[in-house]
Amino acid sequence: MGKYNLILSEYLSFVYNSQSAVQIPIYYSSNPELEKRCIDFHAKCVDNSKKGLSLKPLFEEYKDVIDNATLLSILSYSYDKYNAVERKLVNYAKGKPLEADLTANELDYENNKITSELFQSAKEYTYSLMDPAILTSLSSNLNAVMFWLERHSNDVADANKIYKRRLDLFTIVASTINKYGVPRHNEKYRYEYEVMKDKPYYLVTWANSAIEMLMSVFSHEDYLIAKELMVLSCSNRSTLAKLVSSPMSILVALIDINGTFITNEEFDLEFSDKYVRAIVPDQTFDELQEMIDNMKKAGLVDIPRMIQEWLVDCSLEKFTLMSKIYSWSFHVGFRKQKMIDAALDQLKTEYTEDVDNEMYNEYTMLIRDEIVKMLEVPVKHDDHLLRNSELAGLLSMSSASNGASRQLKFGRKTIFSTKKNMHVMDDIARGRYTPGVIPPVNVDRPIPLGRRDVPGRRTRIIFILPYEYFIAQHAVVEKMLSYAKHTREYAEFYSQSNQLLSYGDVTRFLSSNSMVLYTDVSQWDSSQHNTQPFRKGIIMGLDMLANMTNDPKVVQTLNLYKQTQINLMDSYVQIPDGDVIKKIQYGAVASGEKQTKAANSIANLALIKTVLSRIANKYSFITKIIRVDGDDNYAVLQFNTDVTKQMVQEVSNDVRYIYSRMNAKVKALVSTVGIEIAKRYIAGGKIFFRAGINLLNNEKRGQSTQWDQAAILYSNYIVNKLRGFETDREFILTKIIQMTSVAITGSLRLFPSERVLTTNSTFKVFDSEDFIIEYGTTDDEVYIQRAFMSLSSQKSGIADEIASSQTFKNYVSKLSDQLLVSKNAIVSKGIAVTEKAKLNSYAPVYLEKRRAQISALLTMLQKPVSFKSNKITINDILRDIKPFFVTTEASLPIQYRKFMPTLPDNVQYVIQCIGSRTYQIEDSGSKSSISKLISKYSVYKPSIEELYRVISLREQEIQLYLVSLGVPPVDASTYVGSRIYSQDKYKILESYVYNLLSINYGCYQLFDFNSPDLEKLIRIPFKGKIPAVTFILHLYAKLEIINYAIKNKSWISLFCNYPKSEMIKLWKKMWNITAFRSPYTSANFFED
């Protein structure tokens, strides 16, 4: 058993170090004899500890248990309610506490003043601006750091340097916190006025960020960056991250490309040894210098110096340091402003009459034409999704807030809730449901607001619109997205691509006669100037489309959509400002509509096209690519002569002038070698990603539990690590120890072992080995997995009560009746289950389920009860396969060059040997014929799980299933009788298995699983035709080989002689594999 259990026991003796503290290990075994010994051992430990006797003799007596059984958990109890943190902290508080500069920020409350100066009383106080929003406390974080420091105080050589650097940084944190005292959190991990009143307001979130940074320090450069950001972020709570990361947009334009990867016709990355010189006009250097001067003005010293030293020769090798600074800057934490300031920010832009109306006109027309192009085909064909748009909207209605809390009746139960799905049900029950009327959002019904906080940017507001807006927009937006899916201009939506494809697209056309124009248009999207032309363009497009059809239902759908745009042109928002709720006329576009992403992309594409058409009046060039990705757009322009400094200068100034004619406050840059957009940046022909995910501060509080957050923390750590920001793994494990412990009573706590947290069950939190997803196949692993399966689904009385009410039942049957032509138990049950699952976001239901799960878990962690089950997990399948594989050593040469310099060595090595992939493996079943057939006639979208169940039914049943969803009987019977059906069986099984094995997550998404180099290492003699079995054997082999390579940086070859007799057995088993959701899978999904 790995490092985790070792750290766990050391951590327990570190935290509970008093005389009265006892730790009792609990073991289990799948072997009945040994299991008896485990139970005896536990009983005696409890007995001895009650009598105050030592446990040492028992460890000797039960050596067989300790050596051969598996650690399940550690039970720890300790009577001293510790203020141990304070006691230990004093030893580190030897330095000078930081003093915040109280004039560093423009907005008064963003200064790190003593809380009682910002908020005179508890009544005024709000924690929302400094809330770390994570279910772990500052004291735990301090404990985790001190634990690490104590553990490593005797390190030697290089390890000692790391220790010294971290100790030095922690001294700053400890001294500052010690001056004011450690803030105590309440049971919800919030910091109340009483605790904070005599302490600096941002102390907690600052300290969390500082700890996260210091635990990510390895080299001397890390130390300098961290120290500077730590010290300054104590005062500057507003602009620090922006100042530090601004230069990157120019730095990417300074490095020559000497060899790069480009996308070829087959959509693969292929190496090109082209050389492209970075052509940089003087003005660009002046702008960069100004940014560096601003950094110095803000008190930064080392970071600007590092940038200036790099500028001497602008080498790609040393660029990793620039990339590091860029990533680190985000770890100062979130900028959380008051809502009023976030909203007024957009309204401050002054109107000028002096704008180029012709350009606005062109922009509007381009939006109109794009909308028409996207929707023309579905509208002309009276697409069933547009005809049944209301039903489609209801089926995919989320359980997010509808803006206001209402009293709802479900049977005898009366509850208060803001959730959309519950409001819809209630409205239908009371006959108040009128999807044909889009409520106004004018001064009488102003829009309530949500918020989005991001490091290094201002807080943005989000509209919480009534559910009618969602229903009206859903179907149309889905059609827009499916058009964008096969349009390369829309980088974000382009079919199954990933960011590597977009990277190859840019580098492909870079040469001595081309330049790339890249613009960050986030300011434009939320500006008032955009509103009228944007909404009008959409309205005009919808009007044109309405004339292309005679179907009243399609016209109605388009009209409702149009109505949402008309209403939003006259929008008011409500902002709580202290006690009063202010109503403000809000003339800008904000997120919150279903169309936000799609419509912004359309608008940004129209914007860059408008700009390019103006530039074309003056220069002669060919536009090689135009791309829009979220808030950014970029284009590669090819001229008929080599690009000169003079040209870059002129084009750059012209582009900026053109944007300014539209009053668009955007950041437009021109370069010959690289770009920087929000999602990725390309420099020196290589691709980089910002590793900016905060670990110890969260953007907002959701309804995830501590276990979920431990999994999210680990997932964030992995993503950062892949992107070049590594936090000490021991620290992360210590956090997981803290966050997954379960309190039994005040003094009793249970700490799960590594086996519990890494086995893929509903409780999985992390992987024993970073980047490697293991599926345990030993007896003990399968035993514990079975045990956990028995307590996975917990009931909730509240949910059952709501679900058995007439209101709920009527709603579900209304959906079923509208959707189905004839009875279909699978679908009806599916809808009921989905609707019931949406109730989970209603806190009381969630808490009830959670409590039940925790108490079941407590029982299980003290004594696992395995149960015989006919459920088969992916582990069972792999366990059947494993014995037939024979391993031999092999070798693969490194044959591909690096294109993603930030990757960890072991992952980089694997890619360099087998190559990378530029596509997502299809794991949703949407490519199968049955899925296409259903979507041709119905608005219902079966999940991969449902398809997997349906495709293995008898042919007659499949036919009934299809017919009930509105597929014509003749099509259904043709389908079942054709070869396509048997291909589908294979396709869906394949997708399902890929889905189970998380092939599109973590670092697996980077590897080319179909690499011929990988295939060379696998030998499986061909026996009989069961493609599904061949598939699983090959996939298993590939994962084994890749996992081995990640772990050992060397290769193995696998030979498998799978008996024909076993094949049929395996094939049958493969049709009832159970999938489970765990905090770990949700965290991965959350990353998506």
UniProtKB/Swiss-Prot annotation:
First-listed, main subcellular location of the protein, grouped into a coarse class: virion
Enzyme class: transferase
The UniProt record lists the keyword Transferase: yes
Catalytic reaction equation(s): RNA(n) + a ribonucleoside 5'-triphosphate = RNA(n+1) + diphosphate
Enzyme Commission number: 2.7.7.48
One MF annotation (Gene Ontology) recorded for this entry: nucleotide binding
SUPFAM superfamilies membership: DNA/RNA polymerases
InterPro entries xrefs: DNA/RNA_pol_sf, RNA-dir_pol_4-hel_dom, RNA-dir_pol_luteovirus, RNA-dir_pol_reovirus, Rotavirus_VP1_C
Residues in RdRp catalytic domain copies: 501-687
Keyword field: Magnesium, Nucleotide-binding, Nucleotidyltransferase, RNA-binding, RNA-directed RNA polymerase, Transferase, Viral RNA replication, Virion
Any one cellular-component term (Gene Ontology): virion component
Cofactor: Mg(2+)
Biological function: RNA-directed RNA polymerase that is involved in both transcription and genome replication. Together with VP3 capping enzyme, forms an enzyme complex positioned near the channels situated at each of the five-fold vertices of the core. Following infection, the outermost layer of the virus is lost, leaving a double-layered particle (DLP) made up of the core and VP6 shell. VP1 then catalyzes the transcription of fully conservative plus-strand genomic RNAs that are extruded through the DLP's channels into the cytoplasm where they function as mRNAs for translation of viral proteins.
Assembly and oligomerization: Interacts with VP3 (Potential). Interacts with VP2; this interaction activates VP1. Interacts with NSP5; this interaction is probably necessary for the formation of functional virus factories. Interacts with NSP2; this interaction is weak.
Family: Belongs to the reoviridae RNA-directed RNA polymerase family.
Protein name: RNA-directed RNA polymerase
Natural source organism: Rotavirus A (strain RVA/Pig/United States/Gottfried/1983/G4P2B[6])
